[in-house]
């Protein structure tokens, strides 16, 4: 298993030298458009802040709607898993381990038809082989739109 060639995950030194916002800018890629060829880039996900126990990103509604004109639930869940996976990676040795989503659920409590959503993922459990993240999405008015939970499995790169 190899990571995306343009992906420059933060090193332990980066956490001491860079702010959560600077780490997020690194994940947004050199053009600020996300990492080419990834689902996150296609969905328009942009990182705002990244830390080992909290990751924040935004995603536009435009381009991610279902036929009725609202934000697609699948796009919302993809955003949740993206943040949980990246947040998990921040807690690993990226040369030896990777984290992948193995369980994901979400409850959509309010529809969104314009603007963007902001997602905040918080680490709620960290074990040797599993990490569990709680992700809350809000609209531009600060109203909760979805509540999600994602479990990531930690695996060795050679596995």
From Swiss-Prot:
InterPro entries: HotDog_dom_sf, PAAI_dom, Thioestr_dom. Its EC number is 3.1.2.-. One of its GO terms (cellular component) is cytosol. The keyword rRNA-binding does not apply. Pfam families: 4HBT. The keyword Nucleus does not apply. One of its GO terms (molecular function) is 1,4-dihydroxy-2-naphthoyl-CoA thioesterase activity. Keywords: Hydrolase. It comes from the Bacteria. Belongs to the thioesterase PaaI family. NCBIfam families: unchar_dom_1 (TIGR00369). This is Putative esterase DR_2406.
